[in-house]
Curated annotation (Swiss-Prot):
It comes from the Bacteria. InterPro entries: Ribosomal_bL33 (IPR001705), Ribosomal_bL33_sf (IPR038584), Ribosomal_zn-bd (IPR011332). One of its GO terms (cellular component) is ribonucleoprotein complex. Pfam families: Ribosomal_L33 (PF00471). Belongs to the bacterial ribosomal protein bL33 family. HAMAP family: Ribosomal_bL33. It comes from Fervidobacterium nodosum (strain ATCC 35602 / DSM 5306 / Rt17-B1). Keywords: Ribonucleoprotein, Ribosomal protein. Signal peptide: none annotated. This is Large ribosomal subunit protein bL33. Disulfide bonds: none annotated.
Length: 49
């Protein structure tokens, strides 16, 4: 079963992206994505929606 999660910028705390992940995976997602508020690529970590 897949659950919906948000991706939050580690630098500014802005939630920029939403995605899904497999519920059985316990590790938090950590992806390098573009943040329009910071105007650069930063790491984004998983948060609850």
């Amino acid at each position: 079963m897949r659950v919906q999660v948000g991706l939050k910028c580690e630098e500014c705390g802005n939630r920029n992206y939403y995605t899904t992940k497999e519920k059985s995976k316990k590790d938090k997602l950590r992806l390098k994505k573009y943040c329009p508020k910071c105007n650069k690529h930063t790491f984004h970590t998983e948060t609850k929606v």
